[in-house]
Amino acid sequence: MTDNIDYVEVTINQSVAILIDGNNIERSIHSITKSQETMLNFDTLIPRLLDNRGLNRLIYFREGKNISSKLSDRLHQYYHGSVVPCHKSADIPLSIKATQLASKVDTIIILSGDADYVELVRHLKGEGVRIEIAAVEETTSSLLKEEADYFHA
């Protein structure tokens, strides 16, 4: 007896916010490649992270005043993203923004391997938000990977 099942294509209608700890990601990439010149390729990274889901927000948090206007313009032009300069670390501004966005999105993707985000991940999951971490695996906290709903290496 064979079941003849027709599969119906399901449309995933999820809203995603991508929050980037720029300094953490840059340090990780530079450490792995041993080059200060290596940069993220957002044109391949963002679509891969979204995986056919809708982008609600993209915010790149960067410590310091020397933020590339080219990066800022590119993120705005292609992803309606923004770059937020931070006085010191991005941890607090990123955490505040994630908490503010929790009721507006289905998923938050945090680009950072920093263990400082473990409590934020726990809090957001408690609020019902799916949390994904995208980072360089070799420099990412194992606890952060365990707490996340999904880890993008």
Residue ranges and their predicted role:
Residues 2-92, 103, 130:
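Domain-level signal for Mg2+-assisted phosphodiester chemistry and nucleotide/NA-binding surfaces
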Residues 64-153:
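Nuclease catalytic cores that cleave nucleic-acid phosphodiester bonds
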